[in-house]
Amino acid sequence: MKKAFLFLTAIMVLHSLYTFAMVASREFYQIKVYHLKTTDQEQVVDDFLKQAYLPALHRAGIAKIGVFKYNAQDLQEKLIYVFIPFKSYKIFEKLEPALEKDLQFQKDGANYLNAAHNKRPYERMESILLNAFSGNPNFNLPKLSTPLSERVYELRSYEGPTEKLFKNKVDMFNKGDEIGLFKRLNFNAVFYGEVVAGSRMPNLMYLTTFENKADREAHWKAFGEDAYWKKLSAMPEYQNNMLRNDTRLLTVADYSDF
């Protein structure tokens, strides 16, 4: 009896350690969104990101940062998205203090950092924080052959009707292996993330990439016709788990790392 108890205890400890390791190995993401009204604002933010912010993040040990643009004609504004991957939340916490001590960053970004109140470089800036999905714990660089200017990056945001149903949609990606379907069909996803802080919650986001618009259309056609997708989407346990799908087709800034 004692040996059986010790064996079961050991199994439970190992399971706990494994679970902790899996959670600890998941990356943490920040998406900064700049809301712009004028071309002057866009130029100031572009210059800041290209000449100061991205180089400073590189010095801080973040090798690849994605910068993407969205022309929101319906909202009469332009958006610049900055995707920053961190190995952990602790590393994210250390970034701002590091930037404050980076004299080169302060010098290179002076025009943006010291902007006057009546010459602000943006209308609004928001920050979205995400935990990587367990089914795809690390971000991936897209394997594309076309120039950055031709590529289409598709950012999707799935809001859930309730927290419970939102978790069900996340489970559909992980345990239901919707992520595996995307991989099999070569959607070149950069990340899948669960929003832990942002203006839209409960929410998940993911970014897929394509050679061009025709390539995107062909991929989604194959997705909709795939036998596994038809099976997965028809499962009773995965019904009514999404309230709103916000899809945005982004272009890549010429100074983006990918």
Task: Place the predicted regions along the sequence by residue.
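Bacterial Sec-dependent N-terminal signal peptides
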Residues: 1-25
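Short S/T/G/P-rich N-terminal loop/turn motif that feeds into the first structured element of a domain
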Residues: 20-106, 111-229, 239-258
